[in-house]
């Protein structure tokens, strides 16, 4: 039997994101650096502003664009109700997208995401996970669950899911090796 080719990470990630954004029903959602294709689809039921260092050329009702860096977001402290950043922070500081090399790029990006999310606001976040913190040079980093939760200290973990291979799991299973973690968190 021949199957339709799919990239499982983005299939699971985008479905997970859509479910939560639909359930949350924010008046306006903000996304930093994720897929323009995904945000375009989701903008059809929730107004979305995308923030990225690379502008998009297309226009779509309910989809707005703001040029900006995840290291210096163009928003006031505690100003955003719902925020997402899907498979983005693991690239920051590795030079892959023309950014400067910085061994703490991911940590600085997370600090900035935390800064702009209002108290009581919800963060939808995904990153590669592994059995230890690693750098796959010039591609991305991978993190342990404990390290991610440490970086989001002061946030309440509402849900976590993990993708390994072609399956989703409800718990972190480091013995499975490389995967992707999906986290829904509320700022306390």
Regions found by a protein language model. Give the residues of each.
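Acceptor-substrate binding/catalytic loop of class I
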Residues: 103-104, 125, 130-147
